[in-house]
Structure formats: C-alpha cells, structure tokens
C-alpha cells in the first residue's frame, strides 16, 4: 500500500512538473525583454502562488505552533512541498527541475513564509546550498547533485559561516590542503541551516596558506558528501525563533574531497559564494515580506474583533493609523524584493538591489511583528496567540545571509561607486 502510494505521488508530481515546466517555457517565449515591470502576474505565476498559498494556509498554519513548540524537523511538510513542486524551484530543466526564475521562486517563498518561516526556511534552505552549483558547477556536477534532488526530497546545506567568521566571510579559517588528486579539509562551521539533514554541502575553505592572499584568490568552493569520513555533526541548536529549522555546527577533520568536486577551480570559491547571495537574497527578502503580511493580517483581524472603551480597536484612530503604516511598509518591502528578483531574471548584476531588499524587508518584518504584538496588547505576549511567534521568527531576517548592517555597507559601497563613475 505504502509503495503504491509513493508511486502515485511520484507520477502526480511528474505530471505537475511537466505541466508547469511546459507553461514556463511557453511564457518565456512570449516574454519580450526590456519591457520593464509588469504588475500583472502570468497565469503560471498565479498558479504557483495559489498552490503555495493553499498549502501554507491548509497544511502549514494548522501545525506551525506545534512544530515551534517541539522543534521537530517538519519532514511531512517538506515531503508534501516537494510533491507539489514548491521545493527546489531553481534547479535547471536539464537536471529534471522546473528551472524557475528568481521572481517566481520569490512568489512561492512569500506564501510559504506566511504560514511559518521556520517551515519555509527548512524547505528553502536548499536554495542557498544549491546556488553555487547552479551558477558555477559543470554539467557532471549539476546532474549528479541537483538531478537526484528532483528524484526524492533530499536536503543540502551552505557551509560557510564559522564560529569566528560570520559577516566577515573573508575571515574563515577552515583549510583545504591539496594532496595529489584530492584535498584534505580541516575546520569548523557554525549556524548551518539543514546541517544535520543535508545529503551534501557546499563548503568554502581557504586553499591558499598565504594570509595576505586576496579573498578572490584565497578560497576554494567544494561539494562535500555529508557521509564522508571525518565529518562530525553537532547538536541541533535551540534558537529564539524558526525553531523547527535544523541549525547545527559541523566539524571537518581530515575530510578527503576529490578534485572533481571543486567548483570551477582553485581560488574561485569566494566569488562563487558571494554570487550565490545575489541570487538568494531576494528570496530571503520575500520570506520576510510573507511574515510581515501575516503580522498585518493577524493585527487587522484582531482589531476588527477586540473592543476597548466601548468600541472596536480599529475604530480608534491610533490603531487604524498603525495598520495604515504597516500596510505601507509591507507593500514597499514587497516591491523591493520584486525589483531585486527582476534584476536577476533580466541577467543583470543585482548586488545593490538585493542588499536593499534584504535590509529593508528584514527591518520591516521586525517592525510589523512588533506592532502586531502591540495591537494585541497583553494577549500578544502570550503563546496562545500567533503574533509572539512572529516576533521571535522575524529577528533572524536581520541576521542570516548578511546582517542588516552588512547590507548597508554593501549599499553604501555600491551607491558611492555608481556616483563616482
């Protein structure tokens, strides 16, 4: 019975993927480059959005609080998202994937995050892990590591952050020593999303022992199988928010990696790692917008039901003005990630817009979650109501994939550079 059900799910998923892939190809042929923004989604985009929205509201929201309480990894939801074609949207068509653009992936991400950003991060942690291979892998690497992720719901992880090197990626200490046709990896990584669930990792390590070597030549990117001898996976971290997401430290001790698992070549790793951020930060930003929209909706619903001083909360100008400010902010944050995603899909370097979207949406998610708690009053401080979880979940958006302060450094650098030129 179970085997038959599994075969049925695979057939249905294949049909769904074929339909969406066909529609995506048709839409691409019809799209004329250079026309600028369109505020009307394509039929395919509407379909993706509707599917993700239905999944979030009917399957994620009812169990989100329990996953937050237990910290259990949401395997059933991950499998279901995979079956629906909502997982791994960036995998190219020639590897069996949908080959969606960043804009389309962002629409899915926003809807999933509306349901629960912990679940959304668990589902979409793959996007960051996959991106270095998508942008820099050879055909053999892509088919081997991306192709198998379209055959079953496997996970991967992006192993860059270390205990002493977070925003300062150039400061990582993990070393890769070349010996013949293989590399010996030694070092420690920290705060790795999907670290204990991944089947393989993208790993950034220092391959040039010269401490004065520039970052764009000192680091190499590797694909490392998670079951390679010498890898020690740490305990699941107990985080403030997004608790069902799997976050761990990983130790690499004399881990052997074949040269065929090097991306591009020696010294190309830093550029690859940073290039991945340009493509994934819009998606992360869309997750922050999904949380912000949820905060606005919950606050509005509560204000329409709760009475104080003899009338509904929403009838008090102080509250209605708060909701107006929240609505303004969420719409502007949405526009920021859509602009950044559009830049990616147009084939342009989007570092500037990606950082604006990441910083702004992360800040807005925190502001709206805080405002929602305020509107709920004492109830907002209690776990029986949804907004306290939103407030805890929101904070990480100002930290992971580059802190809000780092984004501002990038924005300033890009802005000043454009001004001088």
Swiss-Prot record:
According to the UniProt entry, which residues carry N6-succinyllysine?
Answer: 69, 179, 212, 217, 259, 271
Catalytic residues identified in the record: 401
Q: What is this protein called?
A: Medium-chain specific acyl-CoA dehydrogenase, mitochondrial
The organism encoding this protein is: Macaca fascicularis
Domain of life where this protein originates: Eukaryota
Protein encoded by which gene: ACADM
Q: Please classify the protein's predominant subcellular localization into one broad category.
A: mitochondrion
Record-annotated residues binding FAD? 158-167, 191-193, 306-308, 316-317, 374-378, 402-405
Processing and modification events after translation = Acetylated. Could occur at proximity of the cofactor-binding sites and reduce the catalytic activity. Could be deacetylated by SIRT3.
Q: What EC numbers are recorded for this enzyme?
A: 1.3.8.7
